[in-house]
Amino acid sequence: MFLYICQDLKSKIMLKKAILFILIVLGCSNSSQAQYEQFYKEFGIMAGPVFLKSDFGARGDFENFTKNSGFTVGGFYYLTFVENFPNIREKFKFRLEASYTSVNMKHYGKYVDNTSNSLFTRQLRAMEGKTTIGTFGVQVEFFPWRVDDYNRGGSPFTPYIAGGVQVNSYSSEVTSSLGKIGTPEATPAKYMSGAKTDQGVAGSLSASIGTRIKIADYHALIFEMRGQYYLSDWVDGLNPNNKVYKENKSNDWSTAITVGYVYYFN
């Protein structure tokens, strides 16, 4: 119990830092817009599959990672300064984004893919989980080439790397066809004190790689792969004691592969 309290306090501190960073960036953005008139804006949408690495399934099992999946959909807004910050404008973009993610989860791997009919195996097979996540965050993108080339007749292919910080509101649900989670009949001993249906807020950090492809003047497609590390291990509804179960070595994290469309205007 003391361990979970310490982890919760640590998560809350990290969440406050994430919120503070987002507010500072938003404040700087609004101040810059008020001071300078020469900037252009972009709006876009994105969607794609997301794969959640959680406490469901055997650690390191590829099937577990690929099948505990869902989808993500969202919108984003870019602000790029054109005239007043030439060094920044040629290499960086600043993106505000909001998204919705839904993932369904089960246990996969060697502990359920066997002929055993033990209580532990049956309990694992009967467990299911679902989590939905609403995310708001910021992302800074670095372009090796000029970010506005595709609007000036330059290369239509513009790759980038990015880093970001987000605030996530999640709702997790853990169920079993054997009965109520938390009872000995339905719950493996590993999850007796480490499974719950709950709602919460957690910060996250992300790293992305992607590219823009111009399809017409002021129109582009975006292809992006993002890894997102949550500052909580409760996003999936499971969090076995990592002092006892050494395989629980990290918080929940996800990989998303998205396709988006962006429209540019002054």
For every predicted segment, state its role.
Residues A34-F39, T80-F92, R146-F157, I215-H219, ...:
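Short loop/turn motifs that connect adjacent beta-strands in outer-membrane beta-barrel proteins
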